[in-house]
């Protein structure tokens, strides 16, 4: 059986535009699908609008929201390093994946909607009848 290739798209926005309030990726919305894909042996690519490091919503790190799985990943230096080196959406826009997942967090409201590379990725996968999802579909 061929290995499935999954693209996990995460936000690069770490602050709300008009107020002094931090945001970013909601950690558990990433760790759960990441863990499931990793356990199944999928090839995982993590990308963000600009590439590079991504902010984590500090509220998602509070004990009330940080479940055991997410806490274990957050405490793993290799996992944290991976989050510091995401590919840019432009880098991966020409590739086809079996599944594209848009991870949540309020930051995504600001850098996903108008991102042309992300729009092209979603349209291309839709046109090819491949799967796309966002955190609300979990």
Regions of interest found by a model, annotated:
Residues 131-138:
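Conserved small/polar residues in nucleotide/adenosyl-binding loops
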Residues 1-127:
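Extended, subdomain-level signal for the structured scaffold at the beginning of enzyme domains
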